[in-house]
Amino acid sequence: HWLVLNDLASPTQKMDVEDLLDMLKWPETVAINEPPPGPVLAKDPDALRVIAKAMDSGKIYSGHAPKLPDKILQSYASTGASSDHESTESGEAWSKLTYGIKVMMRQGSASPDMEELVKLAIKHPAASRHMMLVADEIDPVDLTERGHIDATVKRAIELGLDPIVAYQMVTLNA
């Protein structure tokens, strides 16, 4: 089963494959986000069917590939994932970029990975066109004290990222 948050006020519900395929027909559906890597890599027919339908429908397929060994990451990339927000170190992010997966550099209360990954964008400016600055799981206290994506952009610039590139990463690249 896949978990879908269908409304901010609703609890998480289990959805079956047919539900997901129906939801992909909705004009409001713009993406399939973070399909579990286990079924995808195991070539589960249902998982691959949902991904294929999403891609055939012009929807974005955003991946979820934390710390996969290189050969497994190659297989995962071949399923068509356009992006991933699970990189925690530069080497992992570089591998994803090499295999055509855009890297989301997340900055949040639970996952402050951007500070490590921004070094990669500074070192390889051409790769920065395939990288995004994103917010992820920001604690309400952090949100009120530091801000949202604006704080992430500001911090990336403080770390040495060109300001134009930083704003590109939250607009054009996103």
Regions found by a protein language model. Give the residues of each.
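His/Asp/Glu-enriched, well-ordered alpha-helical/loop segment
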Residues: 121-174
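Active-site-proximal loop/turn and secondary-structure-junction residues that shape catalytic pockets
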Residues: 1-3, 36-38, 65-69, 89, ...
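Divalent-metal coordination cores built from histidine and acidic residues
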Residues: 1-58
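Glycine-enriched alpha-helix->loop->beta-strand junction motifs that scaffold or abut catalytic
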Residues: 28-29, 58, 75-83, 98-104, ...
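Hydrophobic faces of well-ordered beta-strands that scaffold small-molecule active sites
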Residues: 1, 30-34, 61-63, 83-85, ...
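Conserved, mostly hydrophobic/aromatic
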Residues: 32, 96, 166
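Active-site-adjacent beta->alpha loops and helix N-cap segments on the catalytic face
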Residues: 40-51, 69-72, 93-95, 112-116, ...
